[in-house]
Regions:
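Charged, amphipathic alpha-helical coiled-coil/dimerization segments
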Residues: 77-135
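Alpha-helical linker/hinge and terminal dimerization helices associated
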Residues: 22, 26-29, 65, 108-126, ...
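N-terminal leader segment of winged-helix/HTH proteins
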Residues: 1-37, 130-131, 147
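C-terminal regulatory/oligomerization modules of transcriptional regulators
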Residues: 1-7, 103, 125-151
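N-terminal helix-turn-helix DNA-binding core of bacterial DNA-binding proteins
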Residues: 17-20, 24-68
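Short helix-coil-helix linker/hinge
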Residues: 37-42, 71, 102, 126-128
């Protein structure tokens, strides 16, 4: 779709504002749930990555979160000070830093199992609607990332 069309310029009619304000609302909905776990939203996303695949590099985590390593490093330091992860330098290449779950980090996964269900209830939407929305958003993100790579 390369055709240019005139779009409304009011705030409430902007796709970007709908996405931005929904993201803020979603993050706020997570806050009281994650407070019980002692995690912030970015820390929770990081832990989700580690629960999927332990012993990953800082660079890999940053890529999955669409952040740079400099942004992820302080987040990881806080998780380490909480006892959920440990940072280990690579044996073959000391520039690489691997992130590993501690026993506390593994145990935290059990406590976090209820988080998705609580958020699902907060949305008051059907599973089908939310799965379709997630798929549509992932497709939009991919299209935008492709666009950004060209420019």
């Amino acid at each position: 779709m390369t055709q240019r069309t005139a779009f409304p310029v009011t705030l409430d009619e902007q796709l970007c504002f709908a996405l931005y304000s929904t993201s803020l609302a979603m993050t706020k909905a997570y806050k009281p749930i994650l407070d019980r776990l002692g995690l912030t939203y970015p820390q929770y996303l990081t832990m989700l990555i580690l629960w999927e695949s332990d012993d990953v590099t800082v660079k890999d985590i940053a890529a999955r979160l669409n952040l740079d390593s400099a942004t992820v490093t302080p987040l990881l330091k806080r998780l380490e000070s909480q006892g959920f992860i440990e940072r280990v330098r690579g044996t073959e290449d000391e520039r690489l830093v691997f992130i590993r779950l501690t026993r506390s980090g593994v145990a935290l996964k059990r406590s976090a199992r209820e988080v998705p269900g609580e958020i699902f209830c907060a949305t008051q939407q059907t599973p089908e609607f939310l799965m379709r929305l997630r798929s549509d958003l992932q497709q939009l993100r991919g299209t935008l990332n492709d666009y950004l790579e060209r420019y």
